[in-house]
Swiss-Prot record:
Molecular function GO labels: rRNA binding; snoRNA binding
InterPro entries: Ribosomal_uS4, Ribosomal_uS4_N, S4_RNA-bd, S4_RNA-bd_sf
Domain of life of the native organism: Eukaryota
Record Pfam families: Ribosomal_S4, S4
Start and end residues of each S4 RNA-binding domain: 109-175
One Gene Ontology term, aspect cellular component: small nuclear ribonucleoprotein complex
This protein's name: U3 small nucleolar ribonucleoprotein protein imp3
Organism: Schizosaccharomyces pombe (strain 972 / ATCC 24843)
Amino acid sequence: MRILKHHEQKLLRKVDFLNYKNDDNNHRDVMVMRRYHISKREEYQKYNIICGKFRQLAHRLSLLDPTDPFRLQYENLLLEKLFDMGILPSKSKMSDIENKANVSAICRRRLPVIMCKLRMSQVVSEATRLIEQGHVRVGPHVITDPAYLVTRSLEDFVTWTDTSKIKRTIAKYNDKLDDYDLL
């Protein structure tokens, strides 16, 4: 490497290229992004902010008097909402929000992960590709965004689109292909 000029040395005086600080704080987000096939770090950061807001709301509710009717009403409302979204496994207690409402819980409700859970796809990356190509619908709506969060009530309505070649191939394999569907 060449010797740096005076103005370059002044600019890089506090930078050491040989012993840089190893930042191990991002290993968790890299693991979550890889496991759930999140392509953009901004999505992970949004999920992290949402989890922080859940925790903040739960903490503020816990500061109120335990017999306060406002606290009881909104605790039940928050627990029910998070359970219906699929983020919490049960609507039992507020401490579950601190322990179990995390980024992974939100990522488990993404459409590609639900497709793998329903055995529509073997891996999350393949499910993401199929969603982006428009092969999947939730209810009557065709979804092309892999970041779509599926609630517990909509989980039963995740199917292939009517025009999808995958649906036709599955019906042909199961001997349920109707001649009317070929039109």
